[in-house]
From Swiss-Prot:
Annotated organism of origin: Xanthomonas campestris pv. campestris (strain ATCC 33913 / DSM 3586 / NCPPB 528 / LMG 568 / P 25)
Keywords assigned by UniProt, alphabetized: Cell inner membrane, Cell membrane, Membrane
GO cellular component, one term: plasma membrane
Function: Could be involved in insertion of integral membrane proteins into the membrane.
InterPro entries xref list: Membr_insert_effic_factor_YidD (IPR002696)
UniProt protein name: Putative membrane protein insertion efficiency factor
Keyword Signal assigned: no
Pfam families attached to this UniProt entry: YidD
Chain intervals for the UniProt region annotation (Disordered): 72-93
Membrane topology of this protein: Peripheral membrane protein
Keyword flag Cell membrane: yes
Primary location recorded for the protein, binned into one broad class: membrane
């Protein structure tokens, strides 16, 4: 099942690269954030997978409007998977 999520993630990143290469130049620079929303989405999907990465990208797109000041807004770091930082009650390998 993990393989399917990797394929979906690669497909989403390929679509974002297509947008950035062919569509974005026609629209001109519009993003008020650094990194741009498309770069943010590609990084989020690569770091967190297609499901959570897409959610983070959608939240970012929701903030990209004329009434938001914008600025530097990096993708959050991936959480560490140490037993001390986990809230689950199951054993860790």
């Amino acid at each position: 099942m993990a393989y399917h999520w990797q394929v979906i993630g690669r497909l989403l990143i390929a679509l974002l690269r297509f947008y950035k290469r062919f569509i974005s130049p026609l629209l001109g620079p519009r993003c008020r954030f650094a990194p741009s929303c498309s770069e943010y989405a590609m990084t989020a999907i690569a770091r967190f997978g297609p499901l959570r990465g897409s959610w983070l990208a959608a939240r970012r797109l929701g903030r990209c409007h004329p009434f938001h000041p914008g600025g530097f807004d990096p993708v959050p770091d991936a959480p560490t998977s140490s037993p001390s930082s986990c809230r689950c009650k199951g054993p860790h390998p």
